[in-house]
Swiss-Prot record:
Principal place of residence: membrane
Topology class, membrane: Multi-pass membrane protein
Protein name: Uncharacterized protein MJ1365
Residue spans crossing the bilayer: 255-275, 284-304, 308-328, 370-390
Alphabetical UniProt keywords: Cell membrane, Membrane, Transmembrane, Transmembrane helix
The keyword Transmembrane helix belongs to this UniProt entry's keyword annotation: yes
Gene source species: Methanocaldococcus jannaschii (strain ATCC 43067 / DSM 2661 / JAL-1 / JCM 10045 / NBRC 100440)
Cross-referenced NCBIfam families: traB
């Protein structure tokens, strides 16, 4: 049986409430069957599910929220979007190996609530907030590791058998410990913060109720129980803090971006002034700046199998945009928008990324191609900038 049932009685300051936590594997057929049995036997006054508004809508309508790709490009949220796709793709592939759709046990809980006229409560944090906080907290090394995993993922990496899936549910602490070791940041944002968020939501919902059932992933059960006990003992959890995308960090990031850009501009202008009396040196500096920033940015577009017109635009714009510290003026944004103009993006492209079985399939997907063009053109220009700066500093030395 791929399921965990934990019962905890909580005094919420108003009354005592029995909370039954059903910990499931989100891709297990057994989970669906057991959810109905447990809910029927417990007869709760409400059912809570590990969903937010967006995922609830997607689950009950089988429709995905439309992606505003222009907004993704203009805001530079390429990696955040990639991570969302990785999570969706991974869960879907694992589910397919067991002949079950991800989230089916949540859908079953919703159907049971409707059948018995019970209120349904969405207790998880908004997925966009979770991913934004993850991006703010992750180090550059962690972000690059995820991007590398995307490019090198293999279908075999996602293969699970029944024994392993049972072990994941019965002993989630082993896998939580492994996640902590791989990336403490991912564990804290994707697991621990959401444990706190859902525990607080359940604690508040339990007021004036005798019993509740909550259907959550097995990896969240112990954390939710732990935080429910802390809440019972007077240790409050600030939900506003957990949904805040820290602007202070964004300001610091923006300040750092401006600082790096101003340093680059200062070195570049100093080299221009230094070479004013030496026309040959001035030509060489200008030529190298255009060649390496523009050339490597255009190469990034071509490596992403972008359009020739996009590569030309990247070549012409990179020498200028690398000196402008604005996201909207970044060569990746410009290249991505140009590529988007020549590639029709449909809902099938989003579904295609999630369903992709290989890198070849991804590279034939228009949506993925646009995002890759934006990412690699930015990367190429950045490599060109630092190569030129190294050469310029060498001249001064």
């Amino acid at each position: 049986m791929v399921i965990i049932l934990r019962h905890v009685r909580v005094f919420n300051g108003v009354n005592e409430c029995d909370i039954y936590l059903i910990g499931t594997a989100h891709v297990s057929k057994d989970s669906i069957e057991e959810v109905e049995k447990i809910i029927s036997s417990v007869s709760p006054e409400g059912i809570a599910v590990e969903l937010d508004d967006r995922r609830f809508f997607s689950l009950i309508t089988n429709e995905e929220k439309k992606v505003d790709l222009k907004k993704v490009l203009k805001e530079g949220n390429f990696l955040k979007f990639f991570i969302y796709l990785i999570l969706a793709n991974s869960q879907k592939k694992i589910g397919e190996s067991f002949g079950i759709k991800p989230g089916s046990e949540m859908k079953k809980a919703i159907e049971i609530a409707s059948k018995y006229g019970l209120p349904i409560y969405l207790i998880d944090r908004d997925i966009d907030i979770t991913l934004s906080r993850l991006m703010d907290r992750m180090t550059f090394k962690e972000k690059m590791k995820i991007f590398w995993e995307l490019l090198n993922s293999d279908e075999e990496d996602l293969e699970l058998d029944d024994d392993l899936l049972n072990d994941m549910v019965k002993n989630p602490e082993k896998f939580i410990k492994l996640l902590k070791e791989i990336s403490p940041t991912i564990y804290e944002v994707l697991v621990d913060e959401r444990d706190r968020f859902m525990a607080k939501r359940l604690f508040e919902l339990s007021k004036n109720k005798n019993s509740l059932v909550a259907v959550v992933g097995a990896g969240h059960v112990e954390g939710i129980v732990r935080y429910l006990k802390k809440l019972e003992n007077g240790n409050d959890i600030d939900l506003m803090e957990l949904i805040k995308v820290k602007k202070r960090k964004k300001s610091l990031k923006k300040l750092l971006t401006y600082g790096i850009s101003l340093t680059i501009i200062s070195i570049f202008l100093y080299m221009i002034c230094y070479a004013l009396n030496n026309p040959e040196l001035l030509k060489m500096i200008t030529f190298q700046w255009i060649l390496f920033t523009g050339g490597l940015s255009a190469l990034g577009v071509l490596l992403a199998r972008g359009k020739l017109i996009t590569a030309l635009v990247a070549f012409l714009s990179a020498p200028i945009t690398t000196l402008v510290p604005l996201p909207l003026a970044a060569v990746g944004t410009i290249a991505g928008l140009v590529e988007l103009k020549y590639r029709e993006i449909t809902d099938k492209d989003l579904v295609g990324i999630i369903n992709a079985e290989s890198i070849k399939e991804l590279l034939n997907n228009n949506l993925f191609r646009v995002l890759l063009v934006a990412t690699l053109s930015n990367l190429g220009a950045s490599i060109g900038v630092f190569y030129c700066l190294g050469k310029f500093i060498g001249f001064l030395g």
